A protein has these predicted regions:
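A solvent-exposed, acidic/Ser-Thr-rich amphipathic alpha-helical stretch
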Residues: 25-92
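Short, low-complexity N-terminal intrinsically disordered segments enriched in polar/charged residues
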Residues: 1-37
């Protein structure tokens, strides 16, 4: 694995952790910044674009006093130029 790939994996991992911070703080601007404009979010029960996901979060998350997302088993693969695939397990 070359240095460029390692740096890309680190940057993608940072995005995953910023996403968790944004969700837990209800900072939807931070959450939005974690997505490419044409990204698809697939949470299993939810699959859609970032605007649809954030709208769902705005309605759903305030039900709880607080959330704390633990991100693990971060697998980043299929890095090819400007595209990559990542799969992450989350416990909230």
């Amino acid at each position: 694995m070359d240095l460029e790939t390692l740096l890309a994996k680190q940057e993608i991992g940072d995005v995953i952790y910023r996403y968790a911070r944004g969700i837990d703080r209800l900072d939807f601007d931070l959450v939005r910044s974690c997505y490419h404009p044409d990204a698809v979010d697939d949470h299993g029960a939810f699959k859609g674009n970032v605007d649809e996901f954030i709208e769902m979060c705005r309605e759903f998350l305030p039900r709880w006093t607080a959330t704390m997302h633990f991100m693990g088993n971060v697998l980043i693969d299929e890095i090819d130029g400007t595209a990559a695939r990542a799969e992450t397990y989350a416990v909230a």
